């Protein structure tokens, strides 16, 4: 039996979400249609509202409803410090630590040549323009510690250092509350290499 075309279209749309395969998308679609049509309508309205009202901040590239986001508009922030992150979700995580008082630049991805993601796709030119505006003194690279994140940090670091900026990278090591017995060898090795005096 063939699915109705409207249901097939819904399943395909749900598959666009990260980590959602055909079976999960089908389960979600059937759940929404069988048990939560009101929730489905709310989801549809919310998606439409977000696509119509969210844009990229002109300065840092994160999502905002205004031309300039709240963080970039905050005069209490230190404009000489710029933290580079891969996604708005990474920016939110750093904000939750309440340890960063500088500004941000959100790449909206990371370098991944095999996936066709190069400097243009991560807004490299905008980052360089922002970092070399004469105000920024230090750039903190807070990309993830994946192969792509490391490659992105290396590429950005080399380019920004060649323009006279101080470039630092987030430290790595044993997590707070972590026991050495349960931490992988690579993390312990990096923590040992990045040790500091007390």
Curated annotation (Swiss-Prot):
Q: Which positions fall inside the Toprim domain?
A: 80-175
UniProt keyword NAD present: no
Listed PROSITE patterns: RECR, TOPRIM
One GO biological-process annotation of the entry reads: DNA recombination
Q: Does the keyword section mention Zinc-finger?
A: yes
| SUPFAM superfamilies documented for this protein | Recombination protein RecR (SSF111304)
- Please name the SMART domains in this protein's record: TOPRIM
Q: Which Pfam families match?
A: RecR_C (PF21175), RecR_HhH (PF21176), RecR_ZnF (PF02132), Toprim_4 (PF13662)
Keywords for this entry?
A: DNA damage, DNA recombination, DNA repair, Metal-binding, Zinc, Zinc-finger
Which ranges form a coiled coil?
Answer: none
Instruction: Give start-end positions of each zinc finger (C4-type).
Output: 57-72
What highest taxon heads this organism's lineage? Bacteria
Q: Return the InterPro entries for the record.
A: DNA_Rcmb_RecR (IPR000093), Rcmb_RecR (IPR023627), Rcmb_RecR_Znf (IPR015967), TOPRIM_dom (IPR006171), TOPRIM_RecR (IPR034137)
Q: Could you tell me one molecular function GO term of this UniProt entry?
A: zinc ion binding
| Listed CDD domains | TOPRIM_recR
Family statement drawn from the similarity comment of this UniProt entry: Belongs to the RecR family.
Under the heading PANTHER family, the entry gives: RECOMBINATION PROTEIN RECR
Tell me, in a sentence or two, what this protein's role is: May play a role in DNA repair. It seems to be involved in an RecBC-independent recombinational process of DNA repair. It may act with RecF and RecO.
Cross-referenced HAMAP family: RecR (MF_00017)
| Designated name of the protein | Recombination protein RecR
- Tell me which species this is from: Paraburkholderia phymatum (strain DSM 17167 / CIP 108236 / LMG 21445 / STM815)
Question: Gene encoding it?
Answer: recR
């Amino acid at each position: 039996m063939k699915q109705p075309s409207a249901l097939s279209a819904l399943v395909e749309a749900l598959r666009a979400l990260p980590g959602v395969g055909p079976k999960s998308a089908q389960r979600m679609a059937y759940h929404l249609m069988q048990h939560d049509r009101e929730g489905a309508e709310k989801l549809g309205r919310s998606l439409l509202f977000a696509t119509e009202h969210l844009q990229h901040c002109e300065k840092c590239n994160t999502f905002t409803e205004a031309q300039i986001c709240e963080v970039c508009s905050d005069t209490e922030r230190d404009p000489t410090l710029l933290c580079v992150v891969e996604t708005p979700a990474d920016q939110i995580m750093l904000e939750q630590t309440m340890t960063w008082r500088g500004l941000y630049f959100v790449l909206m991805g990371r370098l991944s040549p095999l996936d066709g993601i190069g400097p243009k796709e991560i807004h490299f030119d905008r980052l360089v323009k922002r970092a070399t505006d004469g105000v920024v003194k230090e750039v903190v690279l807070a990309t993830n510690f994946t192969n792509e994140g490391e490659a992105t940090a290396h590429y950005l670091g080399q380019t920004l250092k060649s323009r006279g900026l101080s470039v630092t990278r987030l430290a790595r090591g044993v997590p707070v509350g972590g026991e050495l017995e349960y931490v992988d060898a690579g993390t312990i090795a990096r923590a040992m290499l990045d040790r500091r005096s007390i």
